[in-house]
Amino acid sequence: MDKVTSEEFLITLLLSYFRIVSFLFTFPFYGSFLIPNTIRLYLAFALSFAVLSFINITPVKVNTFVEFLVYALNELLFGFSAGLILRLLFDALIIAGELIALHTGLGFLQMFIPGMTQMSLFSGFFTLYGTLIFLSLGGGEFIILGLAESFKRLPVGSFNIFYLNPEVFLNFFYESFRLGVKIAMPLILTALILNLVLAVVNRFIPQMNVFMVGLPLQVSIGLIILLLSLPLITITMSNHFQDFFKVFEYFIQSFKSP
């Protein structure tokens, strides 16, 4: 391998590294501070080297440093975009947890998960629970394979910001919000019915302190409904994750090799 080929290989390796590392730092699971930065950097380098070893990638020729910076920014943008789609998927679970906490009277309970902002107890529960379901469905392997496929569809140095379709991200945002509301819907309806019943009771028995009776009742019934609806929530998450696999695959395959 001559000097020029070695330089081209090193440049291609660095550009591949930029794409993968920006994806891993955005992806909810790998981007969590539960995984040290050093591990994530080493993992990104290992994946970059594996991609160049097992996928036939044409080395990138760079004439100037400015051209290299443009390529690097494009690769960072692509990795960030792919990771953002996954983050929108898991944000649906946070939305569901916040809605449930709001309608069960437990919104004041907060927890801290490293790598994420402070969130309600239910948001933390659904985030961890959804992550387990995602990994049990082979989501981790699927994402890595999808990222490797992106190097075939869109070789290093060929991405352009104009390839991104804003409508795709808007659809993901809509589906994320819809999934969050769908998961929280049983608890929302239960809280609505309970509040109506308490309003009627307070109308006929004004001497009763509705707040003293309603809050423990709301929490107890909310937890019971959550436990009863957990199998249905699991099925909903699984179906949505499987649909997401197809959509993410379509997102990767929508790019054409130049």
From Swiss-Prot:
Bilayer topology term: Multi-pass membrane protein
Record-annotated membrane-spanning stretches: 9-29, 42-62, 65-85, 125-145, 181-201, 210-230
Gene Ontology cellular component list: bacterial-type flagellum basal body; plasma membrane
A UniProt-annotated Pfam family: Bac_export_1
UniProt-listed InterPro entries: FliR, T3SS_IM_R
Predominant localisation class: membrane
Subcellular location per the Swiss-Prot or TrEMBL entry: Cell membrane; Bacterial flagellum basal body
Family: Belongs to the FliR/MopE/SpaR family.
Function recorded in the entry: Role in flagellar biosynthesis.
Protein's recorded name: Flagellar biosynthetic protein FliR
Species annotation: Aquifex aeolicus (strain VF5)
